[in-house]
Amino acid sequence: MIGILKTSLQNNDKDFFTIHNINKLTSTNTTSCIFCDNIDPNFILPIKATVLQRANAFDFRGMLITDELVRAQDLINITYPKKRFLYLYHLEWPHITELKFTHIQRILLNDNIELIARSNSHAELIEHLFKKPKYIMPEWDYKTLIEINQNE
């Protein structure tokens, strides 16, 4: 089972592709759910997967994936997931003023968190700065999510 950990779902490209591909998973044998605290009432897509409060992620035992650096700090403290992944969808860390490089290192070099890159060029940069991403997944591709679920 794949769990997606998010603060909220907003009308942006990242969340659109998240839900678009999670919805595609509902017609496969790969089960999924979303842990988040807020969904924009004007969110453009219907959500076909189970949505739970973010606090429920602390009891989750499947593959847990987040695409938010802030939530990746939670991944370090969530005890039960089978595997933890940080999907670096946007390389946004230079633009987050309150996030220091030491915080980023603690997350991106953590042995318990695997990295997922959005493209080959992102993967090369991430590997050069931190460690090699385990997967490359363009725009939350549901086929890659199935592969992660099967391989891990």
Where are the regions that the model predicts?
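Short internal beta-strands
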Residues: 31-37, 87-88, 116-118
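Extended catalytic core of nucleotide-activated donor transferases of GT-like folds
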Residues: 41-109
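A short, active-site helix/loop in glycosyltransferases that binds the activated sugar's phosphate group
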Residues: 74, 111-135
